[in-house]
Regions:
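Compact beta-sheet-dominated globular domain cores
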Residues: 802-837
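Conserved segment of the helicase C-terminal RecA-like domain
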Residues: 330-333, 337-339, 345-386
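Non-catalytic terminal extensions of ATP-dependent helicases
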Residues: 288, 307-308, 393-394, 398-798
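Conserved two-lobed SF2 helicase motor
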Residues: 114-129, 285-296, 306-325
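Conserved interdomain hinge at the start of the Helicase C-terminal
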Residues: 212-236, 243, 300-308
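Conserved P-loop/Walker A NTP-binding site and adjacent catalytic elements of P-loop NTPases
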Residues: 21-23, 29-205, 212, 230-235, ...
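Helicase-associated low-complexity/disordered flanking segments
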Residues: 1-40, 44-48, 256-284
Length: 837
C-alpha cells in the first residue's frame, strides 16, 4: 500500500494532517515539533521556509507536501541540486506514491513527464518557469538544499521559479539558511499566500565542540580510544586528504576481526587504477578517502564500508557532497581557513555549519562531536612549552615557531565565533542570458512587460538591475539584427507584440546546448580524409564543458616539453618565458570551429551563452594509444581520475547521441565503441546511471549500483576489444618510433622484452630504415593482422611497421591473453618477437 492510498476523500487541512501523521505513525515515525509545525502550515496552504538541522527529517516534510498537493489535484515539483540526488529521490517517491504518479526531468532524460509528482534539477524547473511563467501547470514547488540559491554559477536557477511561478506554493528547505526575512516577505507578496518560517536549533543528536592543541595523530588516537569514531577529517584540498590517509597508516585502527570483515565486504571488487591500489591499502586498514576527484565506484565503496560501520576514519574534503550518505560521529577540522580560488580566508558560518552538521547520526548516536585543530605552529609551540614544564627559565628559553609568511591564522576564538554565528544571508545570483529572453518572448502575452517585471522585480540591488537591463537590451538588439525575433504591428491571437521566427528547441540549453551547432559543423568535414573520424571527435569535444583540471595538466605538459626543447636549442630564459605564453593545450580545428561558430551564432544567437571550446582529450588519448591509467599517469591526473572519467563518459554520450548514424564510418564506430568500453571497464556507474535515468522502470538505483560493481568481460564487446588491442600494439609502435626503449621495456619486461631486448631489436631496424611511420595509415587495419584462437584463449597479433620504403616486412608479434584481459579490463598482451617476418 502506497502513501497515495491514504489520501482522504477531501482536501480539508485537518483531514490531510491527520491522514499523513497516522501514516507516519504506522511507519514507526514520531514527528518532531518542527515537522509538525511545518506540515500544519503546508496543509493550510502557506509557503514554508524550513530551516532545521541535518538529520531533522526535512524529507518527511517534503513527502507531506507532495501528499497535500496530490490531495488538491495539483502538480508538485521536487528540485535538487544534482542529478544523482534527483534520481535517488525519484525512486524514493515511487515507493511512496507509486511509479505511475512520479516522473523525472534532468535535462539528460525525461521519464513520465506528465506525472503529478515531478523530480528535477533546479535548472529544469527554471527553464519551465521562464518558458511558461504563471501559465505553467505547477501548483507546488519543494526546493531542497535551498542554500544553493547563493551559488555563483547556478544560484540563478533557484531564484527564477520564485519570481515566475506566483501560482505555486513553495517549500524551501535547508539546514543552513540564515536570515530569510527577505524571502518570507517576497514570497507572500508574489504568491498571495502566508509564508511561515519554521526553525529549530534543537538537533535530534546534540553536538559538543572542542578546540585542541595536540598533534592530529594524538587527537585521533584519543577520539578512537573514547569511542568517538567514525571520524571525518576535513581537509581543504583533495591532495591533503590523500596524504593524510597515507600518514595515518602507522596507527592501528582495527582489530584483526574488523579487518577480516572489511576484506569480506570488499570481496572481488576491482581496484583498477593507481589511486585505487592505494585506496585498497587504506580501506583495509580502516581508513577511507572521499572526495569529488575519485572514481564513483571508489566513493561508493567507501560509503558502503562506512555504512557497515567498518571505517574508523574518513579523510575527505570540505565539499562533502549533497546527498552523500556517510555516517559520521565526529567531524575533525584540520583548519578553519580555506583557499577559495582567489585568497585564503576564514570559513564562512554557512560552510562551517554545513560540514559540522554532519556529525552525529540520528537513530545511531546520542551525541555528535566537532573538533578543530589549532594551527601546526601553535601546536608545536604548545608542545615545546609543555616540555619546559613549570620552570620559568626553561619556558623563557623556548624559541616559539612563527607562522609561515602570509599565513591566515585562526584560534579558539575563531572556532567559538563560527559555532555561535548564524549562516550568512543568501546572496542573489540573478543573471540575464540569451535563453532567458528567447524563453520569455516565446510565451503568450506581452514579452516586454514580462521581461521588464523580471528585470526590475528580482532580488538584485538596483545597481545590478540596471546592469542586467543593459545586458537584456543588448541581447534583444542582437536577436532583432539576426532576424530571430520580429516586432508585430498589432498583438497576435495570444497577445504577443514580438515573436520568434525560429522554433525554440525545448530544453536545448539544459544538456548539450551546442549539439545543433555540432550537426551543422559536421558538414564542413571531408568524409574521405584519413583524419575524418578524429575530426568528428574534435567537433563534438569542442561543444563539451571544459574539464579545467585536465586541460591545465595538458598545458603544463606541453609547456614542460617546450621548455626542455628550448633549453636544448640554447634559447635564453627571458625568451623562453615569453614563448611559453603562446603554448596551450591542443586545440584541433580551432580556426575552422571558431569561424563556423561565429557564422552559426548569427542565426542561432542563443548559443552565444555557450562559446565553442576546441580541445583534444579523447583525440589525444586515441592518437597516443593510451589506456585510462596511462593517460592519467602521463598527465599526472591520478588524484583526479574521477573528473577524467566523467569527461570521458560525457564525451561518449555526446558522440553516441549527437552524430547521426549515417555519418558514423567504420573507423568512427570503432572509436566510439573503444571509448564506451574503456569507460565501462574503468567504472561503469556513470554510463549505468545515464541508462538507468533513461529507463528507470528497468531497475532501481540500488540495482544500478550493484550492476556497476559487476563488470562485463572486456572481450564480450568484440569491436571495442579489437580497438583496445590495436591501440596496445600501436602504443608500442609510437614508443619505438621515438626510440623510447626504456618505456617499452617497462611495458614488456614480464614477457622477456626488457629495455635491452627492445634496444637491440630496434637498432637493427634503424640500421635499415631512417623513419618509422605513426600517421593514420600506420595505425590502419591493413597493418594489423589478428588470428583468433578461442580454443587456447588467446589472439595472435602482428603489428606491421610503416617503414618509409613500404616494404612492410618489420613488425611486432604478440599474443593476447583473453582471460587475463577480462580479469584486468584491458588488452593484456605478451610480445613474442620484434623484427623482420
Amino acid at each position: 500500500m502506497t502513501l497515495i492510498d491514504q489520501l482522504p476523500p477531501d482536501a480539508d487541512p485537518d483531514a490531510l494532517f491527520e491522514a499523513f501523521s497516522s501514516w507516519a505513525e504506522g511507519q514507526g515515525i514520531t514527528l518532531y515539533p518542527a515537522q509538525e509545525e511545518a506540515l500544519i502550515e503546508v496543509v493550510s496552504g502557506a509557503n514554508v521556509i524550513l530551516s532545521t538541522p541535518t538529520g531533522s527529517g526535512k524529507s518527511l516534510v517534503a513527502a507531506g507536501a507532495h501528499f497535500t498537493a496530490l490531495a488538491n489535484d495539483q502538480v508538485t515539483f521536487y528540485t535538487a541540486p544534482i542529478k544523482a540526488l534527483v534520481s535517488e529521490k525519484f525512486f524514493d517517491l515511487c515507493k511512496l506514491f507509486g511509479t505511475e504518479n512520479v516522473g523525472m526531468l534532468t535535462g539528460d532524460a525525461s521519464v513520465n513527464a506528465d506525472a503529478p509528482v515531478i523530480c528535477c534539477t533546479a535548472e529544469v524547473l527554471a527553464s519551465i518557469a521562464l518558458r511558461d511563467g504563471k501559465h505553467a501547470d505547477i501548483g507546488q514547488v519543494v526546493m531542497d538544499e535551498f542554500h544553493f540559491y547563493a551559488e555563483p554559477d547556478r544560484g540563478w536557477a533557484w531564484q527564477i521559479p520564485l519570481l515566475e511561478l506566483p501560482q505555486a506554493q513553495f517549500i524551501l528547505m535547508s539546514a543552513t539558511l540564515g536570515d530569510v526575512s527577505m524571502f518570507e516577505k517576497d514570497l507572500t507578496r508574489r504568491t498571495g499566500r502566508e509564508t511561515s518560517v519554521v526553525r529549530s536549533a534543537t538537533r535530534p543528536v546534540p553536538l559538543s565542540y572542542e578546540y585542541v592543541t595536540t598533534p592530529i595523530t594524538e587527537t585521533l588516537t584519543e577520539l578512537l580510544e573514547t569511542r568517538q569514531a567514525p571520524v571525518y577529517i576535513v581537509h581543504f584540498t583533495q591532495a591533503q586528504a590523500v596524504e593524510r590517509a597515507q600518514s595515518l597508516m602507522s596507527i592501528n585502527m582495527c582489530s584483526r576481526e574488523e579487518k577480516d570483515k572489511i576484506a569480506e565486504l570488499i570481496g572481488n571488487f576491482r581496484f583498477t587504477t593507481k589511486f585505487g591500489q592505494n585506496l585498497s591499502r587504506y580501506v583495509r586498514h580502516g581508513i577511507g578517502v572521499h572526495h569529488a576527484g575519485m572514481l564513483p565506484k571508489y566513493r561508493r565503496l567507501v560509503e558502503k564500508l562506512a555504512q557497515a560501520g567498518l571505517l574508523k576514519v574518513i579523510c575527505g574534503t570540505d565539499t562533502l557532497g549533497v546527498g552523500v550518505n556517510v555516517p559520521i560521529r565526529t567531524v575533525l577540522f584540520t583548519a578553519l581557513t580555506k583557499y577559495d580560488g582567489n585568497r585564503v580566508r576564514t570559513l564562512r558560518a554557512r560552510e562551517f555549519h554545513q560540514i559540522a552538521g554532519r556529525a552525529g547520526r540520528a537513530g545511531f548516536d546520542t551525541a555528535g562531536f566537532v573538533v578543530a585543530q589549532a594551527p601546526e605552529h601553535v601546536i608545536e609551540n604548545e608542545k615545546a612549552l609543555a616540555k619546559a614544564g613549570d620552570d620559568p627559565k626553561k619556558r623563557r628559553k623556548v624559541v616559539r615557531k612563527k607562522a609561515p609568511e602570509g599565513f591566515v591564522a585562526w584560534s579558539d576564538t575563531t572556532f567559538e565565533k563560527l559555532i555561535g554565528s548564524e549562516p550568512e544571508p543568501l546572496t542573489s545570483r540573478f543573471r540575464v542570458t540569451n535563453i532567458m529572453l528567447l524563453s520569455v518572448i516565446a510565451r503568450p502575452g506581452n514579452a516586454f512587460e514580462a521581461m521588464r517585471r523580471l528585470l526590475e522585480d528580482n532580488h538584485e540591488p538596483r545597481k545590478a538591475q540596471l546592469r542586467h537591463i543593459r545586458r537584456a537590451i543588448a541581447i534583444y538588439r542582437s536577436l532583432l539584427d539576426g532576424g530571430v525575433v520580429e516586432q508585430l504591428d498589432k498583438p497576435d491571437a495570444e497577445g504577443r507584440t514580438i515573436r520568434l521566427t525560429v522554433d525554440l528547441q525545448q530544453d536545448f540549453a539544459l544538456n548539450q546546448p551546442l549539439s545543433t551547432f555540432a550537426l551543422a559543423a559536421f558538414d564542413l568535414l571531408d568524409p574521405e580524409s584519413p583524419s575524418y573520424a578524429l575530426d568528428m571527435v574534435s567537433v563534438v569535444e569542442s561543444t563539451l564543458d571544459d574539464p579545467r583540471q585536465i586541460l591545465a595538466a595538458m598545458q603544463n605538459k606541453a609547456r614542460g616539453e617546450a621548455v626542455g626543447q628550448m633549453k636544448a636549442d640554447g634559447i635564453e630564459y627571458e625568451e623562453r618565458m615569453e614563448r611559453l605564453q603562446d603554448i596551450s593545450y591542443p586545440k584541433p580545428l580551432e580556426e575552422l570551429l571558431w569561424h563556423a561558430y561565429n557564422v552559426y551564432k548569427k542565426s542561432h544567437p542563443w548559443v552565444g551563452d555557450h562559446p565553442v571550446s576546441p580541445k583534444s582529450v579523447i583525440r589525444d588519448m586515441y592518437e597516443r594509444a593510451l589506456t585510462f591509467t596511462e593517460f592519467t599517469s602521463w598527465y599526472e591526473l591520478a588524484r583526479t581520475e574521477g573528473i577524467v572519467l566523467r569527461y570521458l563518459a560525457s564525451a561518449y554520450k555526446a558522440l553516441d547521441h549527437t552524430i547521426p548514424d549515417d555519418l558514423k564510418t567504420e573507423d568512427l564506430q570503432d572509436l566510439i565503441a573503444w571509448l564506451g568500453e574503456m569507460v565501462r571497464q574503468v567504472d561503469s556507474s556513470l554510463l549505468d546511471e545515464w541508462e538507468q535515468l533513461a529507463n528507470p522502470e528497468i531497475e532501481t538505483a540500488e540495482q544500478a549500483q550493484e550492476k556497476a560493481d559487476q563488470v562485463k568481460p572486456v572481450t564480450a564487446n568484440a569491436r571495442a576489444f579489437r580497438v583496445l588491442v590495436r591501440n596496445a600494439m600501436f602504443r608500442r609502435v609510437e614508443l619505438a618510433a621515438l626510440d623510447h626503449v626504456r618505456e617499452l621495456g617497462e611495458l614488456d619486461a614480464e614477457s622477456g622484452w626488457d629495455e635491452d631486448a627492445w634496444g637491440e631489436a630496434m637498432d637493427k631496424y634503424w640500421d635499415e630504415y631512417e623513419d618509422l611511420g605513426t600517421g593514420p595509415d600506420a595505425r590502419g587495419p591493413k597493418l594489423l593482422l589478428i588470428e583468433e584462437d578461442p580454443e587456447h584463449g588467446l589472439w595472435r597479433v602482428r603489428q606491421i611497421f610503416a617503414d618509409p620504403n613500404g616494404d612492410h616486412d618489420w613488425g611486432i608479434s604478440a599474443e593476447v591473453d583473453l582471460a587475463a584481459s577480462d580479469e584486468e579490463g584491458r588488452a593484456v598482451l605478451r610480445v613474442t618477437s620484434v623484427g623482420q617476418l
